[in-house]
């Protein structure tokens, strides 16, 4: 883009920000909180419901498989918690680059760029997914090398082949979600996710209980449940649901792929280090004594923690959208206030859930298993589960702020240091050397999360939001394609 165009864009955004700032300054604190909370919940509520529904697909599958036997449950847990989370972390992290780009572009009124960014992200993520496929094909040797029991691995490698289809479903799923969230149009995602969850419950019962197809029935239903919402999202995006931001397939999608790839890689590094953290917890537990019971109990705890995490991840998405929109529109005060509102709201919910799960203890485990030994182990781990829920109510929101501002590269180093140089070594010492077993491993890893949360809090408090606005403008002006140049379209909408 020419220098004059960049200066004009910056001037317009500065004027918009000044006008918006004057209007907001006239409002009282309660009004500001109310207005920002509404904007936050417009994104957060559908995002939370969607994540609950998506996570519910895995929970329902696990509940049905858990009644087949402890070996099947352990195999499913290790496949989804280790292998699928490995690729999920990479792909979701890489897709978060789209969240930064679309959010800031939408705030800057560069609506035509959202569709181009979406198509670039499809290209980058599809290539990455193809590269990840051998992990599932050779899952047996990989899991054995990681020290897992052979009888569990025999079942896990069958499940892993089914998961290849699920892995490819993440490409349209994550990218369309980021694209729609940036425009606060993610209600459609919640609707189709609800339908998909209902279909999954029915298919799971039909194939596993009525026809007794076992693992095959469970994975068939799971695969359908993951792909059904994607088809609906793609139709919504490309068939008129986003006329202002989707202008048809464009040859400009093949331009500037390398910068998008680099931003996607830094985004992937940030989030995958985070998601892999729990996978390593499962791997370390699999090498402890009585691994079958320990794995089952930990899988149940992590699923409960994961359900609460869906709330925090909803606020991660909302914080990212709000911060990126405000930065793109040139409003540093708005970005800062959006951050404070998101953190406070998520933390308040986290405190309530902290006390709820302290009270429930092991009672909830009977949803997933009939084993008394596993239920007793879950009850023993429940205080750690409650503290994990409390800390996870803040940390993902701060990560969302980082995504909205484009700090993924910095947070990657923070995650690497706090999780892998602090949390895991302490967990290994407490679990294996001190002999605290699962508790010791989890305590160490919770300490890593605590340190990471403290570092992100300091980073956020010390942020110069005016400087972040300037950085956002430079990024947008560097990659923007003027609407008049976007003529090489395969198709377009009137």
UniProtKB/Swiss-Prot annotation:
Record Pfam families: MatE
Q: Name one GO molecular function term.
A: antiporter activity
Q: Which residues form the signal peptide?
A: none
| Gene Ontology CC annotations of this record | membrane; nucleus
GO terms of biological process kind = xenobiotic detoxification by transmembrane export across the plasma membrane
The protein's matches in InterPro entries, at most eight in alphabetical order, are given as: MATE_euk, MATE_fam
Q: What family does the database annotate? A: Belongs to the multi antimicrobial extrusion (MATE) (TC 2.A.66.1) family.
Name used for this protein in its record: Protein DETOXIFICATION 21
